[in-house]
Structure formats: structure tokens, C-alpha cells
Amino acid sequence: MDRDSLRQYRYFLKDSIRKKVDFSQTDQNRGIDVPPIEKPYRNDALRIDLVKPGDWKNIAKIDLATAIGNRQSRRVYRKTPLNLEEVSFLLWATQGVRGKIVGGHTYRTVPSAGCRHALETYLAVLNVEGIASGIYRYLPLSNQLLYEFPEEQLASKMVDAVFGQPYPGNAALTFIWTAIPYRMEWRYGLSAHRVIAIDAGHVCQNLYLACEAIGAGTCAIGAYDQEAMDRLIRVDGEEEFAVYLASVGRV
């Protein structure tokens, strides 16, 4: 192994960079406007209203210790589809907004460094009742699902983009989290990137626990073809790019 490269990548896991950042020179402290907390979309884009918290009828109240104890990666799924209420619950559990939007930030169901929430949530939908197959994006501010575009042979393209791992092709849907790094860089400069990765872990763990309440399973996916995945969801790979995935299906 290349020891110099190992040291370089291990350095990323440390917080030593924070002592080298001149925070007086970050864009926030230079008075540059805060970046949007949600990626923009066209006004005429198709949006699906999700079921609001408090209106769920069939989401089980499961003991937290039970959910934690049963949590595991599940790669084999039944053909039974998920429904809109269940998808609404999973999206709320992983990126839902709690309370009011204050001062350009949102309090959500997951923690984020400095409340910056640099992640966007895409869904590759294959088997959800009443929702056409295709690529969607969660809009946490309005609690809606934005229809991005249809995609032919989506199941096989998802499998190809994760180096042949089969379970995204058999799942009801796959969560694809992207990072928009500038949301975090605006405040933290060069110390932003490690905490974006940490934030992704918070989100995915909530998905694991939430799946236990709806009779579903999930499997986190950290191995994927970066360029192929970015092309599939049509992000530029520079200002926004995929950082984490998780397939979800009925078990």
C-alpha cells in the first residue's frame, strides 16, 4: 500500500483541518448571501403531495429498542410495492423539516453540522403504488415529491451504477443522497467536507430505523460508479454529486 496516500486519506477523517481554516474569510463571515437550503425547481414541475406527519394511518409505533435491536442490512425484497404513506414517512424520517424555517436554515429530523443540511434526496422509484417509475427528488420545505424525469431500464441502470450489486434492481426504490458542498463550505470553508460525510451517516441510520416501522428493509450502499450515478440522476458532478445510496423494499 502507498503509505503517503494512506496518510492523506486518513487526514480527511481527522478534524485537524479546522485549526488551519481562517474562519474570518469564509463566505458567511465575508457577508456573502446564504445559499438556498433547497435546490430550485421549475414552477410548472410535477409535484406529488406527501402524507403529512400526524395524518399517517398505518405507520406502526415501534419501540425504539426493538427498532435498534432488529436493525440490519436487508438485500432481499418481496415484490409487494410500498405505498405513498410509507414513502412519505421514510422521507420525513430522513430529511423532514420540524417547525418553522428561520434565518435561512431548517431544523430537521436529522442533525447537521451548523444546521447547514448540504444533502439532497433523490429516489429511483421502481415499485411504489400510484407513482410512475422514474427519478424523483424530495422537497422538504413543502413536503412534496418532485418528478424529475422518467428513465428507461432504470432497474438495470441502477445495478450497473453500483458495480453489479443486484438489490437496487429488485428494490421498491433506492434513496440516492447527493451533496451540494457549497451549503457547508459557505460556513466552514475547507473544514466542510468531513462533516458532510458524517451528516450522510445520520440520515441513513434514520432510514434503517424507520424501515423497521413499516415492514421494510434497507441496505446502505457506499460502493458505486461515481460518474455513472451522477449521469443517471443528471447532476453535474462538481457542484452536486452522489455521496451515498440505500435500497429499500418490502421484507
What are these regions (language model features)?
Residues L90, T121, A171, F175-M184, ...:
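Small-aliphatic-rich amphipathic alpha-helix that forms the alpha element of a beta-alpha
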Residues M1-T174, P181, Y224-V251:
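N-terminal accessory segments that position/regulate proteins before the catalytic core
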